[in-house]
């Protein structure tokens, strides 16, 4: 599913979408490797989106909320070599406020996996262009305070309801015309809060 309003896009992370894009834009993505062990479909879509954003000279910074060890952030940094890249994460695993909310809301029955095996230094050491990276360590949205930038590409990979909906509320109004928000775990049954947050924002904003 892709939703487009005035050039702004919210992407549901589904294999169907990636295969459809691969077929439609075969000159950008090798169709035979999308969604296979040889090609991460998220990276394939990121590559396509980066080419379009660069091709049309779309302004704005890039960002990722939910960086963990920097695997996907490294790809964003690679495909947007001239873009400022904001990296939002606690770098200490999930915040107890977010996990408690999901459990109390019935979105989860148990504490999610631990993602604390990371650090700012580890993430930055993986970056091709670390000089472009701005690390915002702590609880989102508090760590977004004072940011005046607009954004051309945003990855939301925070798994839980509260950070995902906070990310959408912060980034969507700041998304430039033609910008992209990529949302991970929309169809991941282990993290239903991600889907719930997206649906609420779409319903509230009439993004059908």
Place the predicted regions along the sequence by residue.
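A short alpha-helical cap/connector motif
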Residues: 1-208
């Amino acid at each position: 599913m892709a939703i487009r309003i005035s050039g702004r896009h919210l992407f549901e992370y589904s294999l169907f979408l990636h295969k459809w894009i691969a077929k439609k834009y075969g000159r950008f993505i090798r169709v035979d490797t999308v969604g296979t062990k040889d090609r991460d479909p998220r990276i394939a879509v990121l590559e396509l989106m980066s080419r379009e954003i660069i091709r049309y000279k779309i302004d704005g910074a890039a960002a990722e909320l939910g960086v963990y060890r920097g695997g996907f952030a490294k790809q964003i940094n690679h495909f947007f070599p001239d873009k400022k890249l904001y990296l939002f994460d606690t770098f200490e695993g999930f915040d107890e406020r977010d996990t408690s909310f999901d459990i109390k809301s019935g979105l989860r029955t148990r504490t999610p996996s631990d993602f604390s095996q990371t650090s700012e230094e580890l993430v930055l050491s993986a970056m091709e262009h670390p000089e472009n990276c701005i690390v915002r360590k702590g609880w989102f949205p508090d760590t977004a305070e004072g940011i005046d930038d607009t954004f051309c590409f945003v990855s939301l990979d925070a798994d839980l309801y509260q950070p995902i909906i906070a990310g959408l509320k912060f980034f969507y109004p700041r998304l430039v015309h033609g910008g992209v928000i990529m949302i991970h775990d929309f169809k991941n049954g282990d993290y239903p809060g991600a889907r719930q947050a997206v649906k609420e924002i779409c319903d509230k904003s009439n993004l059908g």
